[in-house]
């Protein structure tokens, strides 16, 4: 095969995997692929336009995790239903004695093990109880913002309208910020900063076309528009009046931070460029 794949499993008497049918298709969704006896690779669910994270078969039923608009959800692919549709991130799942167990977190709650039944999560572990009893955690405000050219999933932690704000840009860009517990955001908020983050075009979780909308000469154009427009609008939604704004990001987020401050040098009071990819030719 010319693809890039892993997570091999058998389903309906055929070998399957999660990955790319052709390795140079990236960036695109990782999908469930069917591998014939002759080695031919085809899409199992060609119309399912989301990024598949993990797949597993249990009692002849195929389940998989997938990203969708900042959530990572568990789907019964055989019966074409989601087992949960909450603002959570499911990181892994397993089955035992006809019960479903998941490792999950949310924006304000770190990882725990839950039993999943009828779309509801029941916590059964206490791994982070001592942490959450001692440490204040911050929940988010969420809004899908219309930038005029796209709709962008945007999150904000509100500390105070008179507090400074950090715009944080994720790496990738083919990944997503999410309804997940992110220690960096929690640390910034606890230090007194409002935090805003978004999934601009180029991010995963919104399908193939959205993910590839930074390719070619759109790099640094469509994504910068989405980042800055969603940031400005989210500040208004949150009622923040302080104009002391900072910007930061790592990897691709470091590139975008550098790109933005070079195009808009007076927009932010401070900038932090982390492990940035600034030049494709040299990979510096």
Model regions: which residues?
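Short coil/turn segments that connect the beta-strands within blades of beta-propeller domains
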Residues: 13, 59-60, 98
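Conserved beta-strand position repeated across blades of beta-propeller domains
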Residues: 8-10, 56, 94
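Gly/Ala-rich beta-loop-alpha elbow adjacent to hydrolase catalytic centers
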Residues: 249, 253, 257
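Cap/lid segment of the alpha/beta-hydrolase catalytic domain
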Residues: 127-237, 243, 250, 278
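A flexible loop/linker signature enriched in serine peptidases of the S9 family
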Residues: 1-6, 18-32, 45-52, 64-73, ...
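Hydrolase active-site cap/lid region
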Residues: 207-209, 257-284
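Beta-propeller blade signature
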Residues: 31-37, 115-117
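Non-catalytic accessory segments flanking enzyme active sites
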Residues: 1, 6, 65, 81-158, ...
């Amino acid at each position: 095969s010319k693809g890039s794949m892993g997570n091999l499993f058998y389903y309906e008497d055929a070998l399957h995997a999660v990955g790319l049918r052709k390795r140079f298709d990236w960036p695109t969704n990782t999908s469930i692929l069917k591998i014939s006896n002759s080695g031919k690779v085809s899409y199992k669910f060609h119309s399912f336009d989301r990024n598949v994270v993990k797949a597993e078969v249990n009692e002849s039923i195929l389940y998989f995790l997938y990203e969708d608009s900042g959530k990572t959800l568990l789907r019964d692919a055989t019966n074409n239903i989601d087992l949960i549709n909450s603002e959570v991130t499911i990181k892994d799942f397993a089955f035992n004695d006809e019960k479903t167990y998941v490792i999950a977190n949310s924006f304000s709650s770190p990882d725990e093990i839950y039993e999943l039944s009828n779309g509801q999560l029941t916590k059964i572990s206490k791994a982070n109880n001592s942490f959450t009893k001692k440490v204040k955690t911050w929940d988010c405000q969420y809004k899908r913002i219309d930038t005029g050219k796209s709709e962008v999933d945007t999150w904000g932690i509100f500390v105070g309208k008179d507090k400074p704000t950090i715009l944080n840009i994720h790496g990738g860009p083919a990944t997503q910020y999410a309804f997940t517990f992110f220690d960096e955001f929690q640390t910034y908020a606890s230090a007194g900063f409002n935090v805003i983050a978004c999934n601009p075009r180029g991010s995963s979780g919104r399908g193939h076309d959205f993910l590839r909308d930074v390719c070619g000469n759109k790099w640094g154009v469509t994504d910068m528009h989405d980042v800055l427009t969603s940031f400005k609008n989210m500040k208004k939604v949150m009622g923040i009046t302080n104009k002391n704004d900072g910007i930061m990001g790592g990897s691709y987020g470091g590139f975008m931070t550098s790109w933005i401050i070079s195009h808009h040098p007076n927009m932010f009071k401070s900038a932090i460029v982390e492990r940035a990819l600034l030049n494709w030719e040299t990979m510096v």
